[in-house]
From Swiss-Prot:
Alphabetized SUPFAM superfamilies for the sequence: Nucleoside phosphorylase/phosphoribosyltransferase catalytic domain, Nucleoside phosphorylase/phosphoribosyltransferase N-terminal domain, Pyrimidine nucleoside phosphorylase C-terminal domain
Residues at the active site: 256
InterPro entries: AMP_phosphorylase, Glycosyl_Trfase_fam3, Glycosyl_Trfase_fam3_N_dom, Glycosyl_Trfase_fam3_N_dom_sf, Nuc_phospho_transferase, PYNP-like_C_sf, PYNP_C, Pyrmidine_PPase_CS
Glycosyltransferase as UniProt keyword: yes
Function: Catalyzes the conversion of AMP and phosphate to adenine and ribose 1,5-bisphosphate (R15P). Exhibits phosphorylase activity toward CMP and UMP in addition to AMP. Functions in an archaeal AMP degradation pathway, together with R15P isomerase and RubisCO.
Enzyme class: transferase
Name listed for the protein in its UniProt record: AMP phosphorylase
Species: Thermofilum pendens (strain DSM 2475 / Hrk 5)
Record keywords: Glycosyltransferase, Transferase
GO molecular function, one term: 1,4-alpha-oligoglucan phosphorylase activity
SMART domains, A to Z: PYNP_C (SM00941)
Any one Pfam family match given in the protein's UniProt record, by short name: Glycos_trans_3N
Gene Ontology terms: cellular component: cytosol
Amino acid sequence: MKLKTRILPFESAHYTVVLDQSVAKKLDVRPSDRVLVRFNGKTVVAIANIAKEFSHEHVGVYVNIAKALGISDGDEVEVEATSPPASLQAIRKKLQGLSLESDEIYQVVKDIVDGKLSELELAAFVTAVHFQGMTPSEIYSFTLSMVETGQRLRLKRKPILDKHSLGGVPGDKTSLLVVPIIASLGFTIPKTSSRAITSAAGTADRMEVLAPVNLSIDEIERIVEKTNACLVWGGALNLAPADDIIIRVEYPLGIDPFYIPSILAKKLAVGSTHVVLDVPTGRGTKVKTLEEAKRISQSFFEIARMFGMNLQAVATYAEEPIGHAIGPALEAREALIALRELRPGDLVDKAASLAGTLLEMVGVENGYETAMEALRTGKAEKKLREIIEAQGGDPDVTPEEIPLGDKTYTLYSEEDGFVYYIDNSLLANIGKIAGAPIDKGAGVYIHVKLGEKVRKGDPLLTVYSSSSAKLQAVERILEDSKPVLVGRTAGRRMLLERIQYQPPRQLVLER
């Protein structure tokens, strides 16, 4: 059936069209059935929404279909009913608790990327994987399929180093130090990062204060060839695109069953050969104990080895924010200060520990000291400024030139004592309520660290925002909640333990 297009100002994870009920009846299409949309030799499979009072001469198409087919408003397209996607059978199989074969997994991932699965079908699949789990073979196949259904960065150099953090600790701007440290020593480290989802700033948000991060594959390859590195947003690159679609379903459900293929697929897509996996460990983070950190790391080791990837996991101290700053502009400022002045100490220590681990993975002796030397000599700072310039930013920017929110609120200590507890999740939430990361100048500056002595009236934290209303919302929260508590605590080290791979033990049943 030939219909004229009406482009609707909506976009979804899957392709969607709107048909009048009279048109749907002629096509024998019911709600959520699939239709084939054809235009100028191109086709997409879309999910049909049925409307009661829509033009019977038109088909409503979402923006992503218009982009995929090159459609303009009023163009004539061919619409016909088509069969359900092949991957539905695999989804039903997983719901029954059965393992999937590699070809079934590829079909599921392909249908996700092609927009053939509805959000309901995708949610059912994600939930099934969450409750049924995956075998190592399934995780391997999902990782491989995610890579194969997206673009890849093809750099003509080896080795390629990389880092990834499981997150959960506020203010973790270590990538802004680790990347230039590694690159300044002649190694390649193309860092693709995410924007904040549940935190006040992701690495891409922090770097965007200093330079554009929404770059193409060609631009990234050129920048890496010139500087050995980049710090860019991965969401613009179509690397493992199935992951971005799955995350949209995982987030409202509060589950994350694909975290291993998600992380490894994006590392494989940029060609990473050596990866340090940062596992922040402590109260208020995703990983609470060293035992849990070791268990999670073993799963990563097993899958990484299947791909020939050299992966080293490290559990890092995460009982408090890294450094003092939370929020894009505040953290970008602090990263520049750390590169020049080697403070705050915990940020510098963690960055040198992660960079040092990577360096030792490629044969450099005394990795930590080598990383510190790159900081002390100014090589790392110079390299970051080269990367900033290559990505289109101002290489001469100073911390003081980075604007912050002009509305502030400071919380003061009500007593003498020692800081004995800092609530990571509450601080991250305060940063978001203040407007971060959308408001780049919003965030929280923590004046104190665990174990520090404070006097009554000393500042504990300052909140920045560009909105008076948002700052007032923060003040109301701080009337009832205390993100910083006073008491006594012991000292701490940033690097808790390097976790070693352990071959799986054979299970022997007693007879």
